[in-house]
Amino acid sequence: VEKLNVVTPPITAEKRLTVTDKIELPRITMSWLTPPFYEAGDADLDMFGAVLGGGKTSRLYQRLVYRDQIAQSVTASQGSMQLASVFQVEAVARPGVTLEQLEKAIDEELAKMLEKGPTREELERARTSAVAGIIRGLETSQGVADRLNQYNHYLGTPDYLARDMARYEGVTPESVRAAGQRYLKPVSRLVVLGIPGEKVIEDVPRGTPPKEDVQITKTAPDWRATPPGP
């Protein structure tokens, strides 16, 4: 099967959408289109997301949750996929905090990352976590099979582990900053503001399994009454 050659149209102007949903607290989600899985820039943006919002030591968590106490939670990550990836920042406001306050704080931290990139210590911590995650996934035979299948599916070869690790080893603070400046521009994002209210967007429908034509036999078939021959 030939690999699909699909060009995803870029977002050239910021798009904003406000939706109501059955949620308790307002939330904001920012999304950017980024390079596909394993292509140039994917690993850099993976590290960008880890430093910006990949856990309690990340910049956004330290600023929004700990210092300013304006967010219940905040995350940032590179969602790697085959045709195009999505870099996403999501934050849930604390009671009494507006989405405008959240967006302003996120934009400030994002601007700092885009200007100077991560520190070497931040990058090393993110790199170690990413590589450790790959290694942990290889501790079981099922994990090895999944990893080999993933490489074969996306790249056409199962023999990619060493090169996958090398992707992260080759990332530098400068390459992370450059990838962010190229792909995470304000004009290239979709901003969704979620506020409590009636649900206006339905969930993606899930197909129901077909009903099987099962015949229930209440009596044993005739052949069971005949003992097997020698």
Give residue ranges: language-model regions.
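Substrate/cofactor-recognition hotspot
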Residues: 95, 102, 110, 196
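Zinc-dependent metallopeptidase catalytic helix centered on the HExxH motif
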Residues: 42-43
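C-terminal soluble interaction/assembly domains
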Residues: 114, 156-162, 178-180
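Extracellular/periplasmic ectodomains of large secreted or surface enzymes and adhesion receptors
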Residues: 194-230
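Detector for C-terminal structural segments
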Residues: 139, 147-149, 185-208
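A common structural junction motif
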Residues: 107-118
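Non-catalytic beta-strand/loop surface segments
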Residues: 1-39, 50-100, 121-132, 143-147, ...
